[in-house]
Amino acid sequence: MPLPDDVTNTQMVITKIKNFNSFRRLTLILYAMSVLGLSAQETAIISSDPLPQQNPLVTKAYELLELGDSAEALIHFQQALTENDKDLSALLGQAMIFADLERHAEAYATYDSIVANYPRHAFAWNGRGLAAFNMEDFDTALNSFKQATAEQPINGFFYESLAWVQMCRGAFSEAAEAAKIATLMYNKRGENSAYPLLIAYFAYLEAEDKNNAQASLNYAVRNKPLNTWPSPVIDYLAGNIVGCELIGYVQDSTQETEAHTYIGLKLRAQGDENAANKHLEWVARNGDRRVFEYTLARALNLQDSLALLSP
C-alpha cells in the first residue's frame, strides 16, 4: 500500500497543508500539534502561551508548502533552524519534505532530533520508523513504531506500520497481531483500510495458521472498498479473478508494485516458489519504492537467499 495514510504520513500532511485554505499564522502551531500527533502533555507545555509566536521564516515556509514549492519551503525551514535548532514546527516541516523527496537518512535524522526533544511525539516516532523502514533498518523501525503506538494507541496507521515491519522481519505471528489491532483502531475512528487485512491474511499463512488466514480473507471480502483499489487484489486472493486480470486493473506504478507483490505472495503460499520469485524479484528490481510492498518484497528475497545459504 502507499505509505501515506490520512494525517499520519508525511506526504499526506504536506497535501493537507497545500489544500488547507484557511491556514493562518496564529493556528499554525496548534494545527501542527493536533495533526502531527504531539502528546497532550507536550501540547499543554508548548501552548501555555495563549498567543504562540511563530518564526516568520517558518510561517513563510508553510505558506510555500501550501503553494506547492517544497524546495523553497525547505530553504526557509533550514534558515529557521539555524536560528533555533529545536524549533518544532521547522523540524517537522523539514522532516516532511525530506521524506517526500525520499531523502530518508536526512528525514530520519530530523525526526530523531524531534523525539530527542519531544520524546512523546507520536507522529515523529512514526516518521522516524518510516525513514528507518525505507532504509531497511527494520530493528530501528520496529522500536520507533512501538514508541508511536505507545504514545498514540488509537491510531490504525501506527499499528499498520508495525505490522509491515514485523512482516519484513519474518515475525509473522506478531505481524498478524499488529494488523488485527490496526483494523480495530481504524474502525474505532471510523476509518477504513483493507491493507491490515491483507497483511493479516499472508502473515497467518506464513505462520501456517490457515483458519485465521481464511477468516481474515473472508472479512476482507465482506468489507472491501467498492470499485476502488485494492478491491481487485481481494478478488484475486478470493479466487474470483486470475493474476493477469489483476494486472489489468493496474493504473499506476504503486498499484503495479502491489499487484505483483500479492501475486507473488499467493504463489509463495501455494508452494510455487519459482513463479512467486519471478513476481517478487520484479518488485525488488522495478517496484515503486514509495509503497510498503516494495520493501517487503526485497526483505522476503533476502530471507530466502539467506535460507539457501544456511547449512
Q: Which residue ranges define each predicted feature?
A:
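Alpha-helical segment of the N-proximal tetratricopeptide repeat
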Residues: 52-83, 93-100, 259-266
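Register position in tetratricopeptide repeats
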Residues: 66-67, 100-101, 134-135, 168-169, ...
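Helix-start (N-cap) detector for alpha-helical repeat units in TPR-like alpha-solenoids
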Residues: 53-54, 88-89, 122-123, 156-157, ...
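Residue-level recognition of tetratricopeptide repeat
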Residues: 62, 96, 130, 164, ...
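Structural marker of alpha-solenoid helical repeat scaffolds
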Residues: 83, 117, 151, 185-189, ...
